Amino acid sequence: MNRIKAVVLDLGNVLVFHDDLVLFQRLSAWGGAAPEHIRKRMLELWDAINRGSLAGDELRRAVCRVAGSEVPMDAEAFYALWNCHFRVHHEILPTVDALFGRVKVILLTNVNEMHWRFVRPLIAQFERFDDLVISCDLRLAKPDPEIFQATLARSTLRPEETAYFDDVPRYIEVARALGIQARVFTTAPTFRTQLAELGVVV
């Protein structure tokens, strides 16, 4: 097995938890559309949101329409509601701390500008990451292989020397097809075990 030189981490449900049902329920309470209706309609929007092609006031108006209102809430209220469903996954952070100095630590995430602006200050460790690969900045999003290739290229990494952790199996499959040592993330203890199996003992 090749020695792992970099660990690439997803954001949602790895470093932070995000309960989309909470978001949809809050949007429902504000706009009147049913949470399930909101969930289904948002499925049509997430790719554009993650790629940054739907952003800012346009994003706010689109989400408010999905919630059932042609009149959008004001920007400050929307920002608070749009970020209501995040909480830091504190249990994983000591393991992340232990990776610094051993391997490169990189973030690769599908995220929009407003979510990233809210989440980034919550985790001080981001200041120590070797790279932060943000989908809306690149105008690329998982599962597009290009965003994985861009992540490798930006840090001059070989895929076989790169470990990648994500909670979405479909993204793991794409990464593996590119030769990346990808694993489905489930829990912090399992993450430590997976690292050890890859030769990264922390």
Predicted features by range, described:
Residues 1-5, 9, 112-113, 117-202:
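Asp-based, Mg2+/Mn2+-dependent phosphohydrolase catalytic module
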Residues 99-100, 176:
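Anion (oxyanion) recognition and catalysis
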Residues 93-97, 172:
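Short amphipathic alpha-helical segments and helix-helix/interface helices
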Residues 104-106, 181:
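Proline-centered loop/turn at the N-terminus of a beta-strand
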Residues 109:
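Conserved phosphate-coupling serine/threonine residues in phosphotransfer and NTP-handling enzymes
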Residues 2-93, 101, 112-116:
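N-terminal helical cap/lid subdomain that shapes the substrate entry/recognition surface
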